[in-house]
Swiss-Prot record:
This is Oligosaccharyltransferase complex subunit ostc. GO terms for biological process: protein glycosylation. The keyword Chloroplast does not apply. One of its GO terms (cellular component) is oligosaccharyltransferase complex. Residues 1-32, 105-117 are cytoplasmic. Belongs to the OSTC family. Keywords: Membrane, Transmembrane, Transmembrane helix. Disulfide bonds: none annotated. Its main location: membrane. Residues 54-83, 139-149 are extracellular. It comes from Xenopus tropicalis (Western clawed frog). InterPro entries: OligosaccharylTrfase_OST3/OST6 (IPR021149), OSTC (IPR042416).
Length: 149
C-alpha cells in the first residue's frame, strides 16, 4: 500500500511552503466550543434542515365542532412531519435533558460545597425528569393512543 501512495510523488514535487497561522486567529475557549455544540444540537434536534427544505407553517389550525379555527402546535398522526413550533419545543426539551445530565456530572466535582452540590443535583434531576416526562406528553399529543397501557 505504501508503494501505491509513493507513485504520484515520484512525478510530483511537494512545494516548500512556510505557512503560519494568522495573528488574529486564536483558539476558542472551552465554553465557546461548548456553546456552539449546544446551539448546533438544539438546531439539529429541532429539525432545522427539515424546516428549511419543506418550509412547514409555524403552527397549524384545526376546525372544532362549532366551525371555528383553533391553532394547534402539533401535527397529529404524522411521524414524518412537524410544525416549526413543535420542532422547537421538542428541541428545547432534548437540550434541557442534555444540560441536566451535564449539571449532574458537574455536581461530582470534589471542591463543591455541600449546599451547592445539593442544588446542582436537584436542578440536574429536575431538568432530566422534566424533559423526559414532557417528551412523553408530546408523544401522546403527536400520536394519541401510542403510549397508553
Amino acid at each position: 500500500m505504501e508503494s501505491l501512495y509513493r507513485v504520484p510523488f515520484t512525478v510530483l514535487e511537494c512545494p516548500n511552503l512556510k505557512l503560519k497561522k494568522p495573528s488574529w486567529l486564536h483558539m476558542p475557549s472551552a465554553m465557546t466550543v461548548y456553546a456552539m455544540v449546544v446551539v448546533s444540537y438544539f438546531l439539529i434536534t429541532g429539525g432545522i434542515i427539515y424546516d428549511v427544505i419543506v418550509e412547514p407553517p409555524s403552527v397549524g389550525s384545526m376546525t372544532d365542532e362549532h366551525g371555528h379555527q383553533r391553532p394547534v402546535a402539533f401535527l397529529a398522526y404524522r411521524v414524518n412531519g412537524q410544525y416549526i413550533m413543535e420542532g422547537l419545543a421538542s428541541s428545547f426539551l432534548f437540550t434541557m435533558g442534555g444540560l441536566g445530565f451535564i449539571i449532574l456530572d458537574r455536581s461530582n466535582a470534589p471542591n463543591i460545597p455541600k449546599l451547592n452540590r445539593f442544588l446542582l443535583l436537584f436542578i440536574g434531576f429536575v431538568c432530566v425528569l422534566l424533559s423526559f416526562f414532557m417528551a412523553r406528553v408530546f408523544m401522546r399529543m403527536k400520536l394519541p393512543g401510542y403510549l397508553m397501557g
